[in-house]
Amino acid sequence: FAISSAALPAPAEDTAVGNESETAPRPEGALPHVPPGFAVSVFADGLTHARYLDVMPNGDVLVAELKAGKITVLRDEGGTGHATKRFVFAAGLARPHGIEFHDGFVYVGDTKAVWRYRWNPQDGTAGPAEQVTSNDALGHYAGGHVTRNLAFAPDGRHFYVSIGSENNIEEDPQPFATIKEFDAKGGPGRIFATGLRNPVGIRFYPGSDKLFAVVNERDGLGDGLVPDYLTSVADGGFYGWPYSYIGKNKQPGPLGDKRPELVAKAIVPDLLFQPHSAPLGLEFYEGTQFPAEYRGDAFVSLHGSWNSSVPTGYKVVRVHFKDGKPGGGYENFLTGFWIDGSNPAKVWGRPVGLATAKDGSLLIADDVGQRVWQVRWVGTR
């Protein structure tokens, strides 16, 4: 798949199509489809709105169960390929999403703040919750996008938090629709980049100080607009929302003429996804379990559309990288949740968070099937 920023269709102003997917039971014995040489299995099931993942130094998998307000530990005690033990790591959170292990602590982002918990390497349990960011540093949440995801800079001196907008296409007060930078010790932070309607997954490219984000763009301009995207994020960069999209393409109506000085410097993203695909998870593959050609490439979960007359997404895709930049479009990696191209889409899974397990396999959270899937290479090299 390749979408050119120079060949976008004309906007269909005020065209919104409510076309929510419908949850279907998983067909008996059904598994997602993966490329030849790979195998997929259930690592854990019976979860409550499984969203984001992180992997601890001992191999424990932490999963954010958003609607349950908790972080759960999933442990494969005997190398079985399945979580044989689970327990609550942290509870009482306000829609937790991002999880990041750093320097002996597990950092968690929810709609109130970033919190951290001392990780006990002996048994994998958590110490008391410590609030890291200042009150309202992530905005006073009153509705809108709930995801607050985290990424530590490679030098460990700062961490970054993605904060989505409160609405589809209106001006929001900061820090909504931004990525913020915080000192490792926390505090109020500063605005790092703006004009990002709903940045969700954020990750640093391996071996670099370059931050990347996947972003959910606006709805209401027709099936063909606006492409969601993957982009590197520049300090001080402006990415269009709400005044323009994909660079200097002005939002129809008065909003597009309101801040010409910002539109003039709007950055074109690096790689575009099919509009309304809803990219949520981002993982750069650094393991060795997959063939060598996968190292340095990105996996992106496309959660799937709700605002397109023709459904799209509900899959995980691979983005090829060369010299630290995405190139050549993207390709399917894990599909099959969407039953027979139905419309409205009948789905038995929707992928969200991605993480590389300690053994190098790929873990995928599924907030419809309430599972964590595991993909591993079983072919010859």
Residue ranges of predicted features:
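Blade-level signature of beta-propeller repeat domains, shared across WD40, Kelch, NHL, RCC1
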Residues: 355-381
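Conserved beta-propeller blade signature
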Residues: 60-64, 105-108, 158-162, 210-214, ...
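Residue-level detector of Asp-centered blade-edge/turn motifs that repeat once per structural unit
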Residues: 55-59, 100-104, 152-156, 205-208, ...
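Beta-propeller domain segments
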Residues: 2-34, 147, 165-168, 174-177, ...
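Asp-box/WD-like beta-propeller blade repeats and closely related beta-sheet repeat scaffolds
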Residues: 85-86, 95, 100-102, 112-155, ...
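Hydrophobic core register within WD40 beta-propeller blades
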Residues: 53, 99, 150, 199-202, ...
